From Swiss-Prot:
GO terms for molecular function: oxidoreductase activity, acting on paired donors, with incorporation or reduction of molecular oxygen. The lineage of its organism: Bacteria, Bacillati, Cyanobacteriota, Cyanophyceae, Synechococcales. It is an enzyme of class 1 (oxidoreductase). Keywords: Oxidoreductase, tRNA processing. Catalyzes oxygen-dependent 5-hydroxyuridine (ho5U) modification at position 34 in tRNAs. The gene is trhO. The active site is at C185. Belongs to the TrhO family. GO terms for biological process: tRNA modification. Its EC number is 1.14.-.-. PANTHER family: RHODANESE-LIKE DOMAIN-CONTAINING PROTEIN 7-RELATED, THIOSULFATE SULFURTRANSFERASE/RHODANESE-LIKE DOMAIN-CONTAINING PROTEIN 2. This is tRNA uridine(34) hydroxylase. Residues 127-225 form the Rhodanese domain.
Length: 310
């Protein structure tokens, strides 16, 4: 942690969150932001809270203690990481129907979900020949890294997951009543909600990785690690390597897809303008706009470097 001034905290909790308390917490957090260098994204809904915040350690501690006053702290899932730089520009607080959008209102993860499996037990579970492993993240996240032999539902967003379950899950099960279903995601929230969906549909033996990939990478030594590649994250770092340091991926600012060092060497790649994923998605006029935007970004970087040197 030496030299790393920013504490990055991912958190979520499923619990009944009353509307008046939602706005009360939001206002208190905005007051903290006004007086401190607090950034991140928080989502509030009647089903709970979800998000990631970034600030100096003492500020994060204040925020977490405040959030615990509104939640059942026993069910508040927290994952901590550190960075030399801010990973968000500012604090955004959004109030939505769901803290992670699935679009199935009849499920209730705070009352009915699968069995948590901690990092120590995960390897044994997924090596079991009677277990199928499902990555509940989006296809572009999975392209950056995933667990060995896991199933990719190839979804563009989490709201497509229920349809994948209806259309495809049974084709992966030899026996619906006896096969273990192990699910995982970045920090635990999507796979937890996915287990609630499957239980509602009558599936049995449903498990999810407690704390998600990030907790697993923090807990498991590299020589025992079954995760392959890097872990996509929704901030400026883009992806984290297996030591939870900033990885090798960047973002195509035209389409938002994660791109590797190898991707940037492809002939289709033009920084800030296009990559091989989106070369056919945009018009020439779009690319001209992207080119002007990239020129402005480059000019600002040069100017900022001059200011910092002075």
């Amino acid at each position: 942690m030496k030299g790393k001034n920013y504490k990055i905290t991912s958190l979520y909790s499923f619990f009944p969150f009353q509307e008046n308390l939602i706005f009360d917490l939001k206002n208190k957090l905005l007051e903290i932001e006004n007086e401190n260098d607090l950034s991140g994204l928080l989502i509030f809904a009647s089903e709970g809270i979800n998000g990631t915040i970034c600030a100096e350690k003492n500020v994060i501690d204040i925020v977490i203690n405040l959030i615990k006053e509104y939640t059942d702290s026993r069910n508040l899932n927290i994952k901590v990481n550190f960075s030399k730089k801010k990973v968000f520009k500012k604090l955004k607080i959004k109030i939505k129907k769901e803290i992670v959008t699935m679009g199935v209102p009849e499920i209730n993860p705070s009352e009915n979900n699968g069995t948590y499996i901690d990092s120590a037990g995960w390897n044994k579970l997924i090596k079991n020949q009677n277990t199928i492993v499902i990555d509940t993240r989006n296809h572009y996240e999975i392209s950056v890294g995933t667990f060995q032999n896991s199933i990719n539902p190839n979804t563009r967003n989490f709201s497509e997951f229920p349809k994948w379950v209806d259309d495809h899950l049974n084709t992966h099960l030899e026996n619906k009543d006896s096969t273990n279903i192990a699910m995982f995601c970045t920090g635990g929230i999507r796979c937890e909600k996915a287990t609630s969906l499957l239980k509602k549909k009558g599936y049995k033996n449903i498990y999810h990785l407690k704390g998600g990939i990030l907790q697993y990478l923090d807990d498991i030594p590299k020589k025992e690690n079954l995760f392959e590649g890097e872990c996509y994250v929704f901030d400026k770092r883009v992806a984290l390597d297996q030591e939870l340091e900033k990885g090798s991926y960047s973002i195509c600012h035209a389409c938002g897809m994660p791109i590797s060092i190898q991707d940037q060497k492809r002939k289709e790649y033009r920084k800030g303008i296009q990559c091989h994923f989106c070369i056919d998605q945009f018009s020439d006029n779009d690319r001209k706009r992207f080119e002007e935007r990239q020129k402005q970004i480059d000019r600002l970087k040069v100017e900022n470097n001059k200011i910092n040197k002075d």
